[in-house]
């Protein structure tokens, strides 16, 4: 058995991750405005479309998301367009949605709240 004190930060986050139940996901999504479930089974994810005035604002947001995602070692799928970015989060390791997905979603939302 591995002691938690012997795990590295990266090992610990993988060790602590688990797929959330549908009830847990719905409950936590209620706290995140604009996020919705998409897909099912191993392809289940949470998804949100962020809208912007122009391409520059969209790319600025994408760069900030990349910075946060890299720091969290958790990388969303992004679909980038002129005036919007679709962010899709799931945890491949657990074949579902984990607390890491929901934490990243809240951090991405905070980017826009900070700029208002």
Swiss-Prot record:
Q: What is its EC number?
A: 4.2.1.96
Which SUPFAM superfamilies would you find in this protein's record? PCD-like
| Top-rank lineage group of the source organism | Bacteria
| Gene Ontology annotations of biological process type | tetrahydrobiopterin biosynthetic process
Question: What InterPro entries is this protein classified in?
Answer: PCD_sf, Pterin_deHydtase
Q: State a single Gene Ontology molecular function.
A: 4-alpha-hydroxytetrahydrobiopterin dehydratase activity
**Which keywords has UniProt assigned to this entry?**
Lyase
Asked whether the UniProt record includes Ribosomal protein among its keywords, one would answer no
Instruction: Tell me where the transmembrane regions lie.
Output: none
EC class of the enzyme, as a word: lyase
Keyword Protein transport assigned: no
State the coiled-coil residue ranges.
Answer: none
Known catalytic reactions: (4aS,6R)-4a-hydroxy-L-erythro-5,6,7,8-tetrahydrobiopterin = (6R)-L-erythro-6,7-dihydrobiopterin + H2O
By sequence similarity, the record places it as follows: Belongs to the pterin-4-alpha-carbinolamine dehydratase family.
User: What protein does this entry describe?
Assistant: Putative pterin-4-alpha-carbinolamine dehydratase
Organism whose genome encodes this protein: Paracidovorax citrulli (strain AAC00-1)
Q: What is the lineage of its organism?
A: Bacteria, Pseudomonadati, Pseudomonadota, Betaproteobacteria, Burkholderiales
């Amino acid at each position: 058995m591995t002691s938690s004190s012997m795990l590295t930060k990266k090992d610990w986050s993988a060790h602590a991750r688990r797929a959330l139940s549908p009830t847990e996901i719905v409950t936590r999504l209620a706290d995140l405005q604009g996020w919705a479930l998409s897909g099912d089974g191993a392809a289940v994810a949470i998804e949100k479309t962020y809208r912007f005035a122009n391409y520059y604002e969209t790319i600025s947001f994408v760069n900030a998301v990349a910075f946060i995602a890299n720091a969290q070692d958790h990388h969303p799928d992004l679909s980038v367009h002129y005036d919007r970015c679709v962010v899709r989060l799931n945890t491949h390791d657990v074949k579902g949605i984990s607390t890491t997905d929901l934490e990243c979603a809240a951090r991405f939302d905070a980017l826009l709240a900070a700029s208002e």
